[in-house]
């Protein structure tokens, strides 16, 4: 028994001895024989941890058509520690020039943030407050006199960055510009310096082949647009400035994150922005990737559905441009001129034969007057009557979102400010389009009834003794309207009728009803808007420089005085008229869904902002009067709608008086169908002369809307028959 145990012990000892010998041999081979080889290999491998940029969410229209998505791209960034090592082992300045030369050879532009001209004589350029603060921080840190000239600053940079005297002034400026950008980012502790955004793949290949130290290729995304329309709605994304970084850093954004700058990209940033991931990459000395391990998976942003119908949006922009160009051509202006800072706008915006209009317009201006002023801008908005949802928001002139960033400086100085969103930020006196509000206020307060008749004598004489006797528009032709009730007064747009109603109401009650209609109030849209102003006693002095008098009340009653509203406000006001006083929020968000569309994050809920309460017969009287504007031969929109058969239309034209030497703005509102309203439209043409000149825009929009609806109804019917 003892012998067996002894044998087993010997065997186990022998096994352990053999294993120990094998291990020692392997260790000897690893450390002594091949140690140097493995050491060199490990030194030549590099492990880096980098951010994986999460894709931004898509933007879709109300029917799920993708308007904005993402395209993979590559940015060139500067790695400060590699390009500018503390031991001066790299000729940083020579590398910078080589890099810029490569970039230019491949037709790319690099981002130069030094606010000094690129060629002598060197001078400071115009910069934003943010860039000015960066420059001041740089000068303070590097002990440069804050009053130093551009030449003096560049001279100090040549010394600081050891830029050889053999380099030309232009070459030194290139080096200084890039080193300044890197240095500034260190000072403000933000992102890496992105030298080139969306770099060409050929350039990327050359950079990688040359294994250029200090230059990183970073995978990113750029926005891809499936439409050239809706620029003012969609907005754009870009790198953060200092103020934005302070705001978004608290939310966990990386310093090099791209964020929404305007439009829905900005408004719905919290839904669209994704959460970045991290990846650990092991690379060989030649740049070959050996392994890639995601330590945190990126989470793409959510997808946002808008209330906009992109097909109707396109039709609205085309209709607006077509009518504007027709009027411009009629007045002798060159419609081929590039007003937009963008040469790729559409040929379809050509000039048609203008719709004939009456020689006299009941909204305030003689069409036969000589027009000396050029149309400077226009806006149109289409909303759903029953929900308040914006279906189309158009501003002229516009631009192509996909080329906006590269054309930005050109757009900033382009004729008529194409970046300005007139539909939401332009404010205009409503003119006679305000008269339905005055009518409802008078009917509700019982200063008039639907049967009240007021005689138009051409001149309102109640305050003639005080030297104030405003006239009706028709009196310029030595005519009067005779005796009108409220329906006929709306058809005729009789100033005398509405002067009388306004005088009996007083400005305070008139203001109350206007605000209930949303005029001078926020609409609830998430994109930046102006709220305008409804004429009132409190701020009249601020607007006019005089105290409020009764004449101001009379002018307010016909849409003049201090009243200024946006096209969106006018469209929602018109929708509230069509909806018997119910005003809904103009929120442009339909819903947001997760990146894979599986989960609903948020959904639009109908919100009633205010209600104008009055009897149905009062609404009927106003609706009928607005309908007659389109269908009665005396109506100011009759020339546009007399042969329109797609639906019944209720409308009102208006003229915003601009002053003695400036052609009036044209204003137009409408809703359709009259019997069961679906959409409301507002159109404004700056210096359009009269509201009747805007009516063709609305007709074109209505034709498109009911054509789309008819096609949709046919499809649904065919689908139900197949079931």
Predicted feature residues:
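Solvent-exposed, polar/charged alpha-helical surfaces in well-ordered, non-transmembrane soluble domains
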Residues: 93-97, 101, 201, 205, ...
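Flexible helix-coil linker/hinge segments at domain or subdomain boundaries
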Residues: 707-715
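Short proline/glycine- and acidic-rich turn/helix-capping motifs at secondary-structure junctions
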Residues: 222-227, 715-723
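Beta-lactam-recognizing serine transpeptidase/beta-lactamase-like catalytic domain environment
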Residues: 66-69, 74, 283-295, 308, ...
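Loop/helix-junction capping segments adjacent to catalytic residues or to phosphate/diphosphate-binding pockets
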Residues: 85-86, 314, 691-692
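Conserved helix-loop functional segments at active or binding sites
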Residues: 322-329, 396-399, 628, 707
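Short strand->helix junction
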Residues: 313, 327, 427, 687-688
